[in-house]
């Protein structure tokens, strides 16, 4: 499959220039591709130096190895500090109907204002993992809607995210073979 037909994301944590480059080079080899669509800085670090990240990202971008830079699990203030040095295009964060924190704490508002895309990891949240009071409350609303719209619970949970004005892109996966 050609690179143009499959968006690729890569995550790493050590934010030194040499480690960023090594991570990109190793990922390109393992993925057998020429470039990465989005390089994600996987989580905030108190040791991150935005100038170093910016310079190495710009070098990799000039070389055609990376197209966009994003972050994962960064707060609005952490994104702002990094954006003083380099432009961010994505923040991958936990967001679901059972974990609405970024919707109400200003994170998605900040991202929308800064034109930073949102990717949601664990987009189904704890809905299928536990039988909590929260799940029971949500089920009272979702089950009738699933019947009305002839869809499954997971489809409706994903639709809830996708319909958000922040245009949240769910990152889906499973640890259960039966859910595939």
Roles of regions detected by a PLM:
Residues 1-17, 42:
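Structural motif corresponding to the early beta-alpha repeats
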Residues 4, 20, 36-38:
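Metal-dependent phosphodiesterase/phospholipase catalytic core, i.e.
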Residues 10, 31, 151-154:
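Membrane-targeting and insertion segments and their boundary/processing signals
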Residues 13-31, 52, 75-81, 103:
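Short, acidic/polar
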Residues 28-47:
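Active-site groove signature of glycoside hydrolases
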Residues 44-180:
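Beta/alpha (TIM)-barrel catalytic core signal, keyed to glycine-rich beta->alpha loops juxtaposed to Asp/Glu
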């Amino acid at each position: 499959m050609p690179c143009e037909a499959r968006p690729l994301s890569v995550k790493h944590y050590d934010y030194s220039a040499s480690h960023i480059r090594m991570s990109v080079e190793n990922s390109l080899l393992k993925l057998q591709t020429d470039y990465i669509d989005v390089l994600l800085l996987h989580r905030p670090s108190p040791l991150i130096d935005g100038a170093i990240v910016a310079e190495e990202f710009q070098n990799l971008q000039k070389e055609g190895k990376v197209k966009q830079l994003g972050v994962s699990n960064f707060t609005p203030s952490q994104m702002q500090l990094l954006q003083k040095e380099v432009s961010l295009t994505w923040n991958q964060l936990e967001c679901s109907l059972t974990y609405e924190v970024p919707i109400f704490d200003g994170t998605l508002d900040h991202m929308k204002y800064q034109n930073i895309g949102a990717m949601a990891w664990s987009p189904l949240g704890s809905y299928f993992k536990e039988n909590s009071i929260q799940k029971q409350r949500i089920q009272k609303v979702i089950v009738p809607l699933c019947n009305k719209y002839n869809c499954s619970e997971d489809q409706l949970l994903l639709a809830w995210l996708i319909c958000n004005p922040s245009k949240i892109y769910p990152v889906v996966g499973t640890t259960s073979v039966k859910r595939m």
